[in-house]
C-alpha cells in the first residue's frame, strides 16, 4: 500500500467502484500534476493484517509473484461486504482472492479475529506446476490463538506463524480437485 496523494500523475491509473448507494467521480484538470519526484511512498499499515501472496515456481526453480490478497483486522471493521473492501480485478493467469459472502475480494477489512474465523481462498487460473504461498501475519498474535492453512485436496492443515511469515509449497496436477478454486482456506483457533 502507498500513502495517498490528492494528485494523479501522468502514467498512473486507479480503479473506482461505486457503492450500492451510488456515487460520482469528477477529475478536474487542476488535479493534474507536473511535479517530479517519488510517485508513491510505502506506508506501514495501521491495523493488524494477514497478507497472502502466491508465487509460481518455474521448471528452473525460479519464482514469479502471481497474485496476492490482503486482510486488515480492526474492531472498527465489519465482516460484511462494504465500501472498505476492494473487489477482485482479474488478470490473465493466476488469480487469488478472498471469497466472502459470495463476493470475490482482493482486500478485505474484517472485524478483529475471533477463535473460529475462517478465510475462504479462491484460486483460479493455475497451471500444472508447483506454487508457493507466502503468508505474512503482522500484529495478529494473541495468547492461545493459532492459525493454519487447510488444503482440501491433500486433506492437510499447515500451522501458520501468526507473528511472522510462513511459506507453503504445493503442486497442481491433472486432477480436478488439485486445481479446484476452493482448495485452500485459512482458519484460526483459540484455547
PLM-predicted stretches and their roles:
Residues 1-191:
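Compositionally biased Ser/Thr/Gly- and acidic/asparagine-rich
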Amino acid at each position: 500500500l502507498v500513502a495517498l496523494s490528492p494528485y494523479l500523475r501522468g502514467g498512473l491509473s486507479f480503479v473506482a467502484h461505486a457503492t450500492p448507494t451510488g456515487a460520482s467521480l469528477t477529475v478536474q484538470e487542476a488535479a493534474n500534476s507536473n511535479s517530479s519526484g517519488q510517485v508513491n511512498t510505502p506506508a506501514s499499515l495501521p491495523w493488524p493484517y494477514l497478507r497472502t501472496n502466491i508465487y509460481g515456481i518455474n521448471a528452473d526453480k525460479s519464482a514469479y509473484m502471481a497474485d496476492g490478497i490482503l486482510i486488515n483486522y480492526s474492531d472498527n471493521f465489519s465482516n460484511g461486504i462494504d465500501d472498505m473492501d476492494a473487489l477482485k480485478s482479474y488478470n490473465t493467469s493466476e488469480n487469488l482472492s478472498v471469497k466472502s459472502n459470495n463476493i470475490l475480494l482482493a482486500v478485505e477489512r474484517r472485524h478483529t479475529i475471533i477463535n473460529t474465523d475462517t478465510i475462504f481462498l479462491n484460486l483460479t487460473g493455475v497451471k500444472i506446476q508447483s506454487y508457493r504461498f507466502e503468508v505474512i501475519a503482522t500484529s495478529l498474535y494473541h495468547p492461545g490463538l493459532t492459525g493454519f492453512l487447510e488444503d482440501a485436496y491433500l486433506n492437510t492443515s499447515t500451522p501458520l506463524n501468526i507473528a511472522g511469515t510462513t511459506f507453503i509449497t504445493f503442486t497442481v496436477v491433472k486432477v480436478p480437485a488439485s486445481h479446484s478454486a476452493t482448495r485452500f482456506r485459512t482458519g484460526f483457533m483459540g484455547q
